[in-house]
Amino acid sequence: MDSYYKNKKKINFSKMHGLKNDFMVINCIKKNVFLTSHIIKKLSNRYTGIGFDQLLLVEKSNSLLTDFHYRIFNANGNEVEQCGNGARCFGLFLLLKGLTNKKKILISTKKKPLTIEFLTENMIKVNMNEPDFKFYNLSSLQNVLDNNFSIKLMNENLICNLVSIGNPHCIIKVQSVKNAPVNIIGDSIEKNPIFPEGVNVSFMEILNKKHIKLRVYERNVGETKACGSAACAAVAVGIAQKLLSDTVHVELLGGKLIIIWKGFGTPLYMVGPAKHVYDGYIYI
């Protein structure tokens, strides 16, 4: 048995989840870990690997202004810019492993820094920065305000709204999320050539000004139990269009988040739980 592992590398990890959006988290602060997209795909397999939606790497900061660096890889091995549920798990990991004793930390990402604040043992608040409605060369804030951007889909024009929360989101308002064709439309939009890097597609049902239901088709993943940045994106669109109040409860398949946004010129906040499942190690 020892000879089987002789030329393999041992990697310690934690399995975590935020509203059933699950992660493999690796501490790379003292020892850098390089994983190819091929290895990440193998690890993400729920039958032959660890199984996860995203891999999170905890790295030391390259700046005196931030405490840590946060990296995210989808199950297909592609590195992405943002993951809201992952940010909360990232923060809890730092606490559980004794890597910080601060009540509030600033972390760098592939794009903008995020602030993570520990409210209670498992409830974490993340400053997700201000939503960006200038979506590449496709859509603008005015398109969102006028609700007039559409995508050609199956010989019909589908009205939707585009927004970036550090990563790209397409928000579609529906009468009922229960009956929404999430996988069919989500897959079609995500693969549309107008989105060369893909896009997360969300289906939003507005119950009242303080409560929405949301289902999410995540790029390179498929439908997930929850997506924090998608919840932020959907609420941002609703508030911009004056359909929602500044504090909204978002009901996802995996649980609930609270999204707070006071409007243009201010940051958007996400509040929700994070859970540690187990620690383990694997040889690769």
Curated annotation (Swiss-Prot):
This is Diaminopimelate epimerase. HAMAP family: DAP_epimerase. Catalyzes the stereoinversion of LL-2,6-diaminopimelate (L,L-DAP) to meso-diaminopimelate (meso-DAP), a precursor of L-lysine and an essential component of the bacterial peptidoglycan. Pathway: Amino-acid biosynthesis; L-lysine biosynthesis via DAP pathway; DL-2,6-diaminopimelate from LL-2,6-diaminopimelate: step 1/1. It is an enzyme of class 5 (isomerase). The record marks H169, E218 as: Could be important to modulate the pK values of the two catalytic cysteine residues. Keywords: Amino-acid biosynthesis, Cytoplasm, Isomerase, Lysine biosynthesis. One of its GO terms (molecular function) is diaminopimelate epimerase activity. It is found in: Cytoplasm. InterPro entries: DAP_epimerase_AS, DAP_epimerase_DapF. Its EC number is 5.1.1.7. Substrate binds at N21, Q54, N74, G84, N85, N167, N200, E218, R219, G228, S229. The active site is at C83 (proton donor), C227 (proton acceptor).
